[in-house]
Amino acid sequence: MNRFQEPEARRIIAELDLPPASRGLDVGCGVGLYALWLAEAVGPAGRVTALEPEVSRVDAARSLTAGQPGADRVEFRVGDGTVLPVPDQSVDWLWCGDVLHHIVDTERALREFARVVKPGGRIVIKESQVLSALFLPGHPELERRIQIAEIRRTLEEGAGRSFQERRQTTLPALRAAGLASSVMRHYLLERRAPLRPADRDYIQHTVFSRNWGERIRDLLTVTEWRERSSLCEPGSPDNVLLDPDYFCLYPISVFIAAKLA
């Protein structure tokens, strides 16, 4: 997802206007690209600690980012979003990109976020698809059915609350954790044919093959699955990504909460 969103993600980070030489925390850093871009934003005297819950993921992020600009200012560590391995009031800001909706105990995580941020610091929650994206232009009914199936599938991982619901309740979650939400920003990512390799790869492999793959097949009718396969399978002559007029629209929301001094 990082490369797919890179132009907009860099813009989002730039518009945060993070203080030069500040210290920040990236909770759920994934492959580490956001951590690199955050490190670039705070300059050569800034520092970013990037957390992932598993050693293998930390090692992968460290390996992927090695030698890239800003990598020497990023420390990758093992850490859980609900039990941060960071002292109280030790960072100037905290970034959590497309991760909070995965944490079942949201309030506990947000209270941990508030614990480690200095008074007056900011907690930035980035969530993709608070509003559903458009990946199948011209097929609104089928795409809605697929989206509903995807929502239902995430109920299990979300302990009875879908990822979509969790994303859409970020504001009340911040309030419940005692944080003042002062800013909410929305960005619309647009991609058109001919697609960049990173865009094509994300849409085909992450969206069509993984998110809309076998995991939701039993939640669609036979007809719906056949239509989905015709439009989404990589070997299909009707794959929408082959259309010279193909486009997708993908919304990103950013919630910025201030920790009161």
Task: Place the predicted regions along the sequence by residue.
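Conserved Class I S-adenosyl-L-methionine
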Residues: 168, 182-261
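Conserved catalytic/acceptor-binding region of the Class I
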Residues: 124-197
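Conserved alpha-helix/loop element of class I SAM-dependent methyltransferases that forms part
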Residues: 3-20, 37
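A short acidic, Gly/Pro-enriched loop at the edge of an enzyme's catalytic core
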Residues: 82-93
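A short glycine-rich, Lys/Arg-flanked "PGG" loop and its adjoining helix->strand segment in the class I
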Residues: 107-122
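A short SAM/SAH-binding and catalytic strip from SAM-dependent methyltransferases
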Residues: 92-107
